[in-house]
Amino acid sequence: MAGGEVVAVAAAAAGTSRTVLVTGGAGYIGSHTVLQLLAAGFRVVVADSLGNSSELAVRRVAALAGDKARNLSLHKVDIRDKGGLEKVFSSTRFDAVVHFAGLKAVGESVQKPLLYYDHNVAGTIILLEVMAAHGCKKLVFSSSAAVYGSPKNSPCTEEFPLTPHNPYGRTKLIAEEICRDIYHSDSEWSIILLRYFNPVGAHPSGYLGEDPCGIPNNLMPFVQQVAVGRRPSLTIFGNDYATKDGTGVRDYIHVVDLAEGHIAALRKLFESSIGCQAYNLGTGKGTSVLEIVNAFEKVSGKKIPLVIGPRRPGDAEILFSSAAKAEREFKWKAKYGIEEMCRDQWNWASKNPFGYASPDSTKQNGHSH
């Protein structure tokens, strides 16, 4: 993709507030984080190829941000395009970077490993090279609980062994190792690696949410698509686990809580020289697949027909986080419960049954909600 093409969302205002580059800022977690950054007073520049995300997400962020949308701009650029990225860094002095850009479908990573190493590892290397060349040495990196593989015990702390099971998880671990090596070579760097568990939910307005291209790779969008009639049933992979109801247990976290975690991480970066450190972002609670389905049925009033399938190879029985380190050092804690996650997911789904491609999307484009 040609780099450096600027899509004007709103004219960025000059000011003394800190300026943050958000790669992948049109994506699911990225767009929610951009909105929270604007609300917190940051100037935000989004760099996104728009290959697996929608420009409409950024336009809706601008609408939701109101007056603060003047502090938002979007560059349509692929982070693997070094020349395009150089132009972005030459146009603005960044105080820090929040790096979301990448591919995230576990199944696809098994089928197309080179594609994942190219986007998630080579792309990160190019970003780090350009950051270093421009003297920007503060980074919040979007990692994943996938770096842990299938831990034998939960809650999972940051000290657990890093044994990812698939190419996606390995790309995240390699990018983490690169960040650690950079810090050891140059202590001016401050890097926070955020390992997310299972992000779900949507902005309470119902105008920002997850818009997966093709087949979703996690539970909640599948539940959502069944509820709005796009799929006939939900397949549960395994109901014979040693859990309370036989289905797998995961740590689901509201995307707004996750976005707030990024703001807290950025503040930590600006406060002190942190080195290179990893933090889990989760609720610290495990919820089963059936509990999610029941909560979604309750808030939506829709029945979710279930099909029981075999276990998927490599799926952990129980995986939930200890987020004690982030709570202690960031003063951050997830606030939303499962019912609120499902409520906001359903609000988004019912307003946007086909994601950002919904027929009335254009009407919602330029208005505050």
From Swiss-Prot:
Swiss-Prot/TrEMBL GO biological process terms: galactose metabolic process; monosaccharide metabolic process
Disulphide connectivity of cysteines: none
NAD is among the record's keywords: yes
Species assigned in the record: Oryza sativa subsp. japonica (Rice)
Top-rank taxon: Eukaryota
Enzyme class name: isomerase
Required cofactor(s): NAD(+)
Residues engaged in binding substrate: 144
InterPro entries for this protein: NAD(P)-bd_dom, NAD(P)-bd_dom_sf, UDP_G4E
Pathway the protein contributes to: Carbohydrate metabolism; galactose metabolism
Keyword Isomerase: yes
Its biological purpose: Catalyzes the interconversion between UDP-glucose and UDP-galactose.
GO CC annotations, alphabetized: cytosol
Keywords in alphabetical order: Carbohydrate metabolism, Galactose metabolism, Isomerase, NAD
Protein family according to the UniProt entry: Belongs to the NAD(P)-dependent epimerase/dehydratase family.
GO MF terms, alphabetically ordered: UDP-glucose 4-epimerase activity
Protein name as it appears in the record: UDP-glucose 4-epimerase 4
Gene giving rise to this polypeptide: UGE-4
